[in-house]
Amino acid sequence: MNDASATSESSALLEPEDMARLRATLRRVIEVGADIEPGLAGAVRQVLDAPGSLWRAQLAWAIGTATGLSRETASRLAAAVESFHNASLLFDDLPAMDDAETRRGRQAVHRVHGEAAAILAGLAFVHRGYGLVLEGLEDLPTADRRAVRRQLEADLGLAGILDGQARDLSPGVADDPASLAAGKTVPLLRLALLLPALVAGAPADLRARLLGLAEAWGLAYQILDDLGDLVARTDGVGTDAECGRLNLAGRVGASAAVARLDLELARAAVAAAEIVRQHPGLEGPLLRLQRRFVAQRHRFALAEAA
């Protein structure tokens, strides 16, 4: 999966001051001591030094602050989401998965520091992510803590991103192409939108709208990534075709994939508008990301027409 296919590294969704605060939190998310084994330390530092677009973390921060969380708590939860995302990329790039050559403009971590160091670094980010979430739950009622735990299990557990990745690695499995695509990207985006809302005690109607937005955006993002495979990406990330797998665009064809993309973007526009009516402070981040997905869709259409 290409982490930058739909958003560039410079695509800030937040205001400059808030973005600077979030970046500062993410830079110190894991303290790499001088006594840590050099290969593992190097693997973790390489990830921290190339943070990518951070759009999931930005969404988590925006939703957290809009629903009443302190900036400190919102920053911790955003850092947790980004930690889980970083772990997923480290694992996704391994030879047993996508066998990627590069990530975020650099050689993939496992190609620089070895597979073992990449796996251990991934585990470090997973554990740090859970630690950051726990720090945000200390003052929550028991029922809310249970809701957060269920969401974490749903998105990060066996039936979440792990099942999505396993199905992606199993050519010939008779899965619905859209469900297969959604299983790769929706869980982490769902967590980014719902985790801060749950910690903030947001009402059920807002959580339902955030869920709908996560599902629409998650599938749209994956379709854009799949369509990128059809126009011969050269970023070094292992494409599905190179890995012997048919993604959604490969299974149903580019025209059908674009039609489904348009449907999901329309669904996302409706969901985002409903959320903004309830929380006007979210207008900037949500509409900026929606516009960027739409712009990416139009760039693909222009490339196909050329």
How would you describe each model-predicted region?
Residues 1, 291-305:
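Terminal targeting/low-complexity segments that flank the catalytic cores of oxidoreductases
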Residues 1-31:
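N-terminal amphipathic/basic leader segments beginning at the initiator methionine
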Residues 30-270, 279-294:
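Mg2+-dependent prenyl diphosphate-binding active-site environment of isoprenoid biosynthetic enzymes
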